[in-house]
Amino acid sequence: MSNVNTGSLSVDNKKFWATVESSEHSFEVPIYAETLDEALELAEWQYVPAGFEVTRVRPCVAPK
């Protein structure tokens, strides 16, 4: 019997790019989240306490 059950824990995360800045450098880091707002929250939660500023979050667009 082959019964595939994705269950309620199945999440469709998307890739976003967060621009993170310090006083000397700026770099982009990947963030995986369901929405743009959630990606911003995750980026701020992860990088602001470490002394960085999150200046931009954008969706990852696959090249055509």
Curated annotation (Swiss-Prot):
GO BP of this protein: symbiont-mediated suppression of host gene expression; symbiont-mediated suppression of host transcription
Alphabetically ordered keywords of this record: Bacterial host gene expression shutoff by virus, Bacterial host transcription shutoff by virus, Host gene expression shutoff by virus, Host-virus interaction
Annotated Pfam families: RNA_pol_inhib
Record note on quaternary structure: Interacts with host RpoC; this interaction inhibits host RNA polymerase activity.
Purpose: Acts as an inhibitor of bacterial RNA polymerase by interacting with RpoC subunit and thus preventing promoter recognition by RpoE. Non-DNA-binding transcription factor that plays a role in the transcriptional switch that abolishes transcription of the viral early genes (class I) by the host RNA polymerase but allows transcription of late genes (class II and class III) by T7 RNA polymerase.
Name listed for the protein in its UniProt record: Bacterial RNA polymerase inhibitor
